[in-house]
Structures are given as C-alpha cells and as structure tokens.
Amino acid sequence: MDFLDFPALVVDESAALPQPASRLSLASLRLNDDEQEAKFVLPNVSKHDTEFTDLHSKMKHFASISLGEIRPASVSLSKEVAAPISNNIEKPTTTNQLLSKKINSLLNVPNYASYTSDSETKRALQILDANHSDLGLNFNQLVASDFVGTLNRKSLRSKLENSMLNSHSDILSNFQSIARRIKRLSGPLERINNAMQNFKDTTESIDFEFEHVKDRLDQLKARRQVIIKLRDSLTLTQLELDHLQNGTINDLFFQILNKINFIKEKATYLLSNEKTTSAGVALLKTMNNNLTVSNKRIYNYLINFIEEYDTLSRQYGERTIGDESLSNFQTSLIHLSNDVQFFQDFLNRIVGLRSKRLLDDFLSQFDIDNKKLQRPIILSAHDPVRYLGDVLAYVHSMIVNELEFLKSTFKLKSELVTSDSVLKDNMDFIGDLHLKLLNEIFTSLANTIRIRLEQIVRFENNPMLNLDIVQCLSLYQMMLVKNGINESSQLMTSLNDLENLARSKIVSSVTSYLKDLDKNQIAAADLLPPDWFVDYLSKLSQLLNKLEQQNETRILTDDLYDKLILDPINNNLVLNLQNWFPTAKKEKSARIDLLIVQINSFDLVKSKLGPFHSTIFSSDYGKSVFSKLETQYTLCVTKLKETMNSYLFESTGMELYFNLFNMIFPIISVQDELDYDMYLSAVENPIMKLAVIHDNIHEKLNTYLPLAVSDFQDVKLFNLMPPAVEEDIVSTCFGNFIKFYKVFKSVLNKIYPEDEEMIMSTLNFTTNEVSTLLGVEDK
C-alpha cells in the first residue's frame, strides 16, 4: 500500500527545484494570479498501454500524457509574489505540472524500494481504478494535495490493509485443514522429494536432444521395415497356406515346402538369443504344424500312387511311369524323408505290398496244378541239385526284376540331387533307397526261401551232391550280392547258413560212410590194404578231386583234415592192421608182414593223396598233415629195414656179433682198417672164441647165404608193393651184411693171427664171394 503515500515517499530529482511538503495545499502557492487551476483529474491508466520496450519509451509516454493535461499558464505573475520566488525558479510551474511530475516520478523511478517492478504498480492502479465504484472511493479527495487528501489516502490504506488481512485470515482459516493434511503428508512427501531428487540425480546425464530423438525415430522406422520384410519372408500368405492344405501336389506345393524349410532354418537362429527365443519357438511350432499337414498329404499321395501302380501292374503287367508323375513322386519322397515317422511308415507299406506280391509269385511256381505255368519247379529225388538251382534261379530273377522296378521308381534323378535341396541333409539315408527297399522286401521272403532250400540241404547225405550244393549256393550268393542284396541281409545270412550246413554235411556224410564200412575182414594173403580202406580212399580222392576242380578252399578246415584223413588212418587203419597180426611184437615174421601191409597201405595213401599235395594240402595245416603221412610211411620203411636186417643176420648166425660190434662202435661208421683196432677188446667176450664162432656161424652161413636173395625177394618182400622200397631194403640189408662180414673177418685175423686156417674154415666165403652171392657190388 505504499503507493498511496506517494507524495511523502517520492524522492525528488536533485536538479529540480525544492517543492512544498505534501501536507501543504498547493493552492497556497499563488503562482498564477490571473486564473485559478482547475481540479486535477487522475488519468485513467487502464486505457493506456503498460507494455514498453524500454524505460525511455515509458518516460516519453507518461510525459506526453502529463503535458496534454496541463493548460498553458499565464506568464504574468504578480511582482510581489514572483519576486522572491523568481530568484529560485527559472520558469513558472503549475499545480498540474507538479502532480504530473510526481506521478511520473512514481511510475518511472526504478529504485523505489517498496516496489519490485513497474508492472506490479501499474497492475495495482488498474485494479484500484476498476473497483473504485465498489470501494466507494472519491478520487478527488484521494488525489487532493492537501492534508485532507493525505488523511483519505491513509484511511484508504488502512481499509485496504484491514480488508486484506481479513481476506488473508479467511484464507488461512480455510487452509488450516489443508495445512494439517500437508503436515501429515510432509514425511511421505519429503521421502518422495528425496527419491525424486535422487532420481533426478541419476537422470541428469540423460540427454533429450532433438537430433538424438530423431535418429532414434529413424532407427525405429528402419527396424520396422526390416521386421516387415522378415514377417513377409518368415510367414506364409493365405494363398500359400490354402494351397498347402487343399491344393494339388505340384511344383507350387513343393515351393511352399521349400519356403517352410527355409523359415525353419532361419527360426533356429532366433533360439540363440534370449530376447528372440520365444519368437523362434513360436515360429518353429507354426512351421512344424504346417509340415505335419503337408507330410500327411504327401504320405497319402505316395500310398495312392504305389497302390494304383500295383493294381494296374497286376491287371495289365508292369507299367511305365511318366516323367512328370515320377518327378512329383520322387520330390514328394524327398520332402517326406524329413519326417521319420511318416517316411518309415511309407517304406513299411511299400515293403508290405511288394513282398506280398513277390511271395504269391514265388509260391505259385511250386503249384503243379497251375495251368498258367509252363514249367513249374518240381522236387526230384534223382536230381536235388537241379531243384535247388531252379529255386535259386527264380529267386535271382525276382531280385533282378524288382531291382529294375525300384531303380526306376526310387532311384533319384540327377536334377533332384542339388546342393540347396532338402536332400542334402538326408542323402546318406535316401541316396540308395532302392537298394534298402530291395533288401527289406526280400528279408520278408527270406524265411520262405530258406524253408524251400533247407529241405534239400538237410536231408542230402551224398558228399558229392553236398559239394555241388555248396557250389550252387556260393555262386548264387555272389550273383545276389552283385544285384544289390547286402551280405548282411537276412536272405544272404540264410543262404550262407545253408552253405555252411551243406559244407558240414560233406564231412559228416564222409565220416558216416567210413563208419558204415565193413572193417571185419581177415588178413589178405597178399598183404594188400584192407578193402574198406581202399574204398574209402577212392571215395575220398573223388571228393578231393572235385574240391580241387571247383577250387573249394573254404571247406578245407582243420576238422576236415582230422576227421577225413588222420583219424581214419591213425585210428581205423592202424588198429585194423594190428588186429590182423597180433603176434607182431613177438614174432619177427609177423612183424615183417605187418610192416609190409602198413607200407602198402601208406603207399596207397601216398598215391591217392599225393596229386593234391600242392592244392588241397597247400595250407599250413594241410602241409603238416601231409608231412605226418610221409613221416609214418618213412617210419614203416625204416622199421622194415631194421627188421629185415636183423632177420638176415639171424639167418646167417651173425646177429649176436653184429650187435656186439655195434655196441663198441657202429659198423656203418667204419672208414678204414685203423678203425678195426677198436673192436680188439671184444676178445674178452666168451662168444668171441673161435670154437663158439664156428658153432654159431659156419653151418647157418653156408646154408642161408646162397638162398638169401631168393628168400628176400621171392618170399619175405614179395608182397611189398613199392618196388623202390623193396630194392632199397634189399640193397641196404645186403650192404650192411657185406660190410660187417669184411670187418668181422679182419678183426678175427687181428685177434687170432695164428689161427688163420680156423678162421678161413669158419668164414669160408671171401668178401667178393659174399657180394656175388648177394648180388651187391663190393665197394
């Protein structure tokens, strides 16, 4: 309210003239005697603009208003009054001019302490002017410059202050409840304020510049475009989805499937980021559902295709498939291979259809009453191998025909095998699908085929026929493998088992044949091998000859050598021959006969098995078996030599002396006459007396020596079959006798030099005469 006391508070300009106090009436100043100043009217400040660009404009405005309200005053002043004043005032001044100056100073003084700005003072005056009727103000009294004006202004100030205080009191009383609430909420508000302050502290670094926001907006727009592109590339259109579910299976259908597989591949990348995992899972789920629908349609299409083809083939024979249909079929097959369950069900269905048809065709070949067959397969007891071959030949023809069909249908065309196709992930599984199906189909037929063949193999006991069966089975196994049948398939396993069975039947049938032979034969007078052994060797040689011709080496096992060669000779033959000559250990003559029949038997073995030495007996074990046979043969010959040598010395009465000299030093090792001295110690033996020697040797020597050659060749060794062995035995025995006769006679001459006549009468043959009698040249 300080503006109401403006006359008392205004600071005059230092350069202006001194003015009377505001409590003095301006009328007391008789500056203008000619005309009394009219009543001053306060200008309506509300009608004037209050907005100025600067202080100078404001001053100019109010100065013009003041000058307009002041009339020109008379310059004629009374000399009495103007005289004292004219010294102090340079020009006359009116009351209106003073008031205008006061108001102008009030409104334009920037340093007035009671006001904060000119706008507030102007606003106060405008409010006072607008409400003067409500306040009942008398402006004439308020602006009066006398004491009454001062009192009115002070009274107005007091009224306004009381009114303001009452208004403020009412406002404060009304705000007490609000203050209480604010006080109650001050704690939470303070905490909120602190939290906001902390939040402001943390967000002080955030820069919300326009360029940054604009760049962010551009990024979001670009991201939106990318997302739209991704959405278009990772989703199916309504037309594509409808064609996938209801459309024809054609190139467009396969293009949609390729798109689905592409989407699935890209969706897996979304799973690598935690932010996009849920999107990737949802996308994969949707695409998998679409693939399930498409795989069901493809499965039904493939089944209908094969069933239709099979039906037409039964009615009109094997049909050919068009290129377009075959391409759609194989492309569908490629896409179905991604679903293991549907694909395996389809393959099982194919295997079932084809195997049933082939089984019917196979069984119909054995129907004699089937008039459609020109030549049914009939089992013949006279030619079981022919029946076996016919069955295998028909099986082979079925495999060849089925392979051609499967190859034309399931072997993928080269243009379908591309690097960017679905096949690249399934090539290992679907690449040789026609061969896999072929093996699966004939796996279903394997048991039926095995039953037809096993009845021949299991009940055939002829080793020759069994060998033919082995060859037939081995040949067809090789042919079937060449035409796509796996060696590990059930059909090949069955054929291999039958081959092994037939191979084992060869050994078992030969051993059964040997067991059935009559071995209760008496000793032959000619000391030839037993008849049963001759028959067995003949059978065995025929078998070995066939094995050699057919180059069948897998049957040449250790078991075959043992059961067919060693056991019959070592157990059956040797025991049988020993039973023929039970006194061979005691009687030298029986032992000679036993050795001769053994040599004859081994010579027969050698003649029968010798031709197979480099073929049948080429294996390590075969060589050892053949070596054992030769060793036994040589051992028998050696034993016969020793026995015949002993028989010769015994027949001439010189056996005791021969043994005595060999105990001292082997006769065979004597080189010259110097070695004779080693036998001089034999004189100490009683049998070395000349009289005893004469009694033991003279008569037997003269009796047997002339007959020795005929006795050896025509009696004892007459039945020995190998002439070389006979010649070797004769020459060895006679040579030993001549050498001993010479040494023995020379030693006696050294021991008894004075009894030369006695020695000559006992050993009355010279060395040359003995050599001549025995037919051996004296060396």
UniProtKB/Swiss-Prot annotation:
Location (main, coarse): Golgi
SMART domains cross-referenced by the UniProt entry: COG6 (SM01087)
GO BP annotations listed: intra-Golgi vesicle-mediated transport; protein transport
Keywords, ordered alphabetically: Golgi apparatus, Membrane, Protein transport, Transport
Alphabetical list of InterPro entries matching this protein: COG6, COG6_C, COG6_N
GO cellular component annotations of the record: Golgi membrane; Golgi transport complex
Family affiliation: Belongs to the COG6 family.
PANTHER family per record: COMPONENT OF OLIGOMERIC GOLGI COMPLEX 6 (PTHR21506), CONSERVED OLIGOMERIC GOLGI COMPLEX SUBUNIT 6 (PTHR21506:SF0)
Protein's UniProt name: Conserved oligomeric Golgi complex subunit 6
Organism name: Kluyveromyces lactis (strain ATCC 8585 / CBS 2359 / DSM 70799 / NBRC 1267 / NRRL Y-1140 / WM37) (Yeast)
Name of the gene: COG6
